[in-house]
Each structure stands twice: as structure tokens, then as C-alpha cells.
Amino acid sequence: MQKAMKMVKDEDGPLNAAAKSIPSFPHCLQPEASRGKAPQRHPFPEALRGPFSQFRYEPSPGDLDGFPEVFEGGGSRKRKSMPTKVPYTHPAEEASIAQESKSLGPPNLTLLFPQPQRPKCDSQMIDLCNVGLQFYRTLEHLGGKPVKQEPVKPSAMWPQPTPPAFLPAPYPYYPKVHPGLMFPFFVPSSSPFPFSRHTFLPKQPPEPVLPRKVEPLESEETKQKVERVDVNVQIDDSYYVDVGGAQKRWQCPTCEKSYTSKYNLVTHILGHSGIKPHACSRCGKLFKQLSHLHTHMLTHQGTRPHKCQVCHKAFTQTSHLKRHMMQHSEVKPHNCRVCSRGFAYPSELKAHEAKHASGRENICVECGLDFPTLAQLKRHLTTHRGPIQYNCSECDKTFQYPSQLQNHMMKHKDIRPYICSECGMEFVQPHHLKQHSLTHKGVKEHKCGICGREFTLLANMKRHVLIHTNIRAYQCHLCYKSFVQKQTLKAHMIVHSDVKPFKCKLCGKEFNRMHNLMGHLHLHSDSKPFKCLYCPSKFTLKGNLTRHMKVKHGVMERGLHSQGLGRGRLVLVQSAGVLRNLEQEEPFDLSQKRSANGPMFQSDVDSTQDCLCQEEEEEAGEEDNCYEVEPYSPSLAPESQQLCAPEDLSTKQEQTLQDPGEGCRDQDAPEEQQEDRSEDHEGSDIDCEGKDIDCAIREERLSSRLLQSGGQGPSFSDYLYFKHRDEGLKELLERKMEKQAVLLGI
């Protein structure tokens, strides 16, 4: 015992001498033996001496044994060599040493830090004697800022709150270490490290934190590369394993894994302790090896250097690419013990065997084949039983998928949850709303190569091209009219029924065509979205704009039959696409109700029917999709106003048309009066019998202006075109329904 005491005193001599020559050493680590030989310095700042006057600090005798290099070199040199083992000290000797050192201090003061017994250290234990120094490195790195860690039971030291940090200023010989690298794990109560965060801070309720989470610091130090923590694990010959040959391997005593490198073994041993020294500076994730951190940083950079040559899928790690390549090969190394089926990955095998255990195998009852997923099994069953049909209970329609039936039932229930924010139009499907929104943006990427008309959707352009072929493959079995598209025939069948599926939600009025409803909705707002191309006039309805351009500007939408395009086609003469540009300038707003309706003027039958017929012609004309305009100038008309038309088909005698301006009496009427007439009759079904004849006479008188003597003379085909206008109007009504079918997407 006396010999051991002498050895301790001999070690205290140079230690005290070194402590004198290092005035910059932290006050809290000053050895107690130097009090008598040097001026006593209080371990606490001036502002905190009051609350801590009843405490004193005395480090344990063995706490400074692990730092001989720090005292020998003035604290500025880092240790480069492996540390030596901590000598074993008998508990009785250690207790006597602690008793003697305690007697040197003032007997009336309580120790600030309780001194635990030194743990036993044998050759195969991890030497963490440097943990104390690492803790001070952490505090220096934080600069007095607290770090969220796993709470340890604090000791009741003082009741009143004090400033959060009272340690001295940081010193230059402590390296910058990220705080999350120090204690990302639970500190047990029997840990050899006697200090904790609560030892230096006042008693306060512990904060609930998640394990291994690091708060990002606002300083510039967090942006720097994280240094590797010097956690000391001593590897000696006891870890060596003889495997034969010249190769040396070191084995882990816990799990018996062996490595050719001591560094890899140290990293592995730290993994058993939960220590992950390498932290990501962006997300705070911890890793055991630096290479794992480098690989993890690729995910933040978006870099995937390893690419599959078969499917061009990229990965961040080579191991992931190798595992992926097993999908493209026929090698299935993992076989099921029940059915001997091979799998590329162990996870797939595990999931497959779990199905055997629970009895949920995807096996075809017809042929006995097994499938990985239930969806593949259902797809396979269609080869035996045919496609599964889901029938609608309302209209007996069949669908292949239940989702299609569900969407179809929304039409019967009039559920349209997707509403356009621009015009208030409602849709059943979200992609229908997305396609409709393109019309408000004016995006038309698809152009017809024949007439040059542009379309928003490719499907609409393909349907439009069928019109140029003039092949009408779909015929109505009631009136024997033929149509180009099947959707148009479906829309045509509304004419033969009393069903009016389109209803105004504001006034309850019903319509059998969508465009009639859309035109009617403009009446509930003050907007006039249709603007004339030649003057500042604006109109609520597109039909009114068409009539205005014909009457005021002499722009005709239809040409003559003699031009070689056939009836229902336009003359490609000038300003191609003027009517095509008659787009909706600004959508109507249902929230803007009309404050007062304008006076409705009574008009003769010819004027009212003319307004309706012109709108019918315009709406049907849009379906032809190849309309172009032919300008007309009143100054070019002959002064005599006499145009020749054949009276008889056999003689072709010419006669003068009586009062050619009689049919145009209402042209000088105010535009608002004409618009109100159209709005009053919009949405009503037209009785073609009797009214079409009057419209034909009206159109014949208006079109007679185009038969100019200077340009081209009257012809027999021109006469036939206007003579049989009443038959053409019926076809115009059907073309309106074609447009309605396109809008509905039938």
C-alpha cells in the first residue's frame, strides 16, 4: 500500500509542475494539489460565484492519466499513437487514494462532481478514456449552445435557474467536432464517463427528443466537412485469428466476424456500441463508415453513377446495380422450400413464403399456375373465362373495369365534381377539365393539313380530318340521315326524343343541345365575349356576331356552289381562317347576374327567324371545320340592283328580283335590338317546316349581292343552291348536334 502511495505521489510531482507552466488550461481541470503552490483561481466566473460557493471541484486521480501528451506538450499537440492500457487498480487501493486526496481539500464543502469507481479494463474491452476530452471538444464546438441528447437522470444541484453555460471560453487546441458525433446513443448509468450534460447545466425538465437526432447549428461550422471522431478502441494480438496463409485477420469477439484491416474491425466494434461517427451535414443521418457517408451524399446531389445497360435505370451504389441485374438474368438463387420457385431477391422469397404460411397464394384454379400478385392472376383468368364485364343497371352498358362503371354512374346521377374556374363548366373526370382549360389558354398545337384549322386536342383533329373524306358511315335508322362520326349520330338521336338533358342551374330552363345551354348562360351575365374583327362591337352570342359580320361588313361564311367545292364547303379566296379566329375572348361569369333585362321589341316573323337561322348556320358551320370567308363590299354592287336568276329549269329565263332590299329591312335596326331578339329565342327548338322556307328566301335575297356582274355572272348551280336552302337547313341542324357530341365527348 505504501509503495502504491509513493507511486501516486511521484506522478503528482511532474503533473503539478506541468500544470504551473500551462496557464491557459481550463479552470475546471486544474488539479487540486496545485492550490498551495500557485495563486488560487476560482473555477467559476464572477457572476456565478454566489450560487456555486458551496461547491468545489476535485477530479479523480485517474481521470488525467489518459492525457499525458496534453500536459507534456502544453496542450497544443494531438495524440497520434495508440493509447496504452489503463493499469488495473485494486478497489481497496483506489478507495484509500481517494480518501487521502479528499482529506487535502476543505472538509466543509461538498464535491461538485461525485467521483465513481474506476471500471475494470482488460485487454479485450474498448478503452474510452478519451471520452472526457471529447466531451470538452463538443462543448467548445457548440460555444455554449445546448444540444438535444438522450436525457440522463440529473442530480439535484441547485434550485434557482442560472445562465445556461458557465464554462470558460473555448481553447484553440481542441479540434472542431460535430456534436452529434459524440453521444448519438444512450448513456448507461454505469458508464465510465462521469460527466453528462446535466452535470454542467442547472436542473430543468428533460426535453422529449428522438434518438440520434442532431439539431442543425446556425454557425458556419456546420457547413464544413465533418471530422472523424477519435473514438479510442485498442486492438491487440488477442483479436488476431489464424486463418492459414500469409493473410492476417482480426476477429470481433462479439459476433466472430473477421476483417483484414484493424480500421474495419474498429468500425465494426463501434457498430455494436451504437456509435456512428460520420454524420451527414444536410440531413444529420449518421453512418459507421466514411464511405457510407460519401455514398449517401450522392442522394442529395441527385447523382446516380451506376446505370443499367438493359433498362437504363440508375443507382447510387454498385451493390444496388448488381442486385438489380439479377432481374434481367435467368438466375434465381433464392428458391422457395415449398414450391421450389426461384426469386432474385431474398425479400421476394420471404414475401412468397409468407403467402404459403397464410394460405394466400395467387394460384390459378384453371391451370394451377402461381403468380406473384393478385392483379397478374386476374389478368391471367381472362384467358380462361374471357373478359369480366361490369353492367350498368341504368342503361345496360358494359365495362371492362369497375372504375369505368363507377365513372359512368356519375353521369346518371349528374355528379360533376370538377368545375372550371374560368367559365363554370362542370366535368365528370379531371382530365376532361384539364383538356377544357387549354381552350381558355388558347393553346392549339394540332393543325389540319388540308384546311389549316387548329385544334387543342389531337383526337379532335383526327375526327375533323374525317370530314374532308366526305364518307358518312353512320346513318340514322329513323330519318336515314348519315354522319361522319358515331358521336354525331348519338347526338342526333336527341332530335327524335323529348329528352332535354342540359338544364340551366340558375333558371331551370332545359335544352337538348349543349351549345344552346352555353349560349343561354351568357344571358345571366353582362359579359359579351364575342368581338367583331372589323369594328369594336361585342356580342353575347356567337350567332349574333356572325349575323353582324354578314350585315354590316358583308362577310359571308358560305360560298357559292359553282366554285367547285360542293355545297357545304367554302370558297378559299381571302383571309383564310377569319371565322376560325372567332374565339371566346373572355369567359362569362355566372356570378354576374343581369340587373335588369332590356326591353324586348316585337319584330316580324322574317327578322326573328333570320336571327335563329343564322345562329343555327354558324353553329353547324363550325363542325365543317374548313370554313373560310369571302369579303363583300357594297360599293362593288351594280347600281341597277338587277340580278338575273332562272325562272324555269328548262328555259333559264332571266327576271329582275323585286325589291331586293325588302329582305334587309332590319339591317338598319339597332344592334342591341337585334341581339335581344336573338336572346329571346335562344334555346328554343326550331320548327323547320314553314320557317326554313322563309329563311331560305331571306338568305337568297342576301346572297344575291354576291352575284356581281363584273366578277362572275349568275349560273344555274347558284340558283339551285339558294333555291333548295330549306333542305340544307335541316342538315345544318344535324351538324349542330355533331358539335354537341364533340363537346360532350360521347
Curated annotation (Swiss-Prot):
Superkingdom per UniProt: Eukaryota
Q: Which GO terms describe its molecular function?
A: DNA binding; nuclear estrogen receptor binding; transcription corepressor activity; zinc ion binding
Q: Where are the zinc fingers (C2H2-type)?
A: 250-272, 278-300, 306-328, 334-356, 362-384, 390-412, 418-440, 446-468, 474-496, 502-524, 530-553
GO terms for cellular component: nucleoplasm; nucleus
InterPro entries in the cross-refs: Ikaros_C2H2-ZF (IPR050589), Znf_C2H2_sf (IPR036236), Znf_C2H2_type (IPR013087)
Q: Where is this region: Interaction with NRIP1?
A: 452-746
Q: Name one GO biological process term.
A: negative regulation of intracellular estrogen receptor signaling pathway
Where are stretches of biased composition, namely Acidic residues? Answer: 613-627
| Entries under Pfam families matching the protein | zf-C2H2, zf-C2H2_6
Q: Which SMART domains match?
A: ZnF_C2H2
Subunit description = Interacts with ESR1 and NRIP1. Interacts (via PXDLS motif) with CTBP1.
- What job does the chain carry out? Has transcriptional repression activity. Acts as a corepressor of ESR1; the function seems to involve CTBP1 and histone deacetylases.
Q: What protein does this entry describe?
A: Zinc finger protein 366
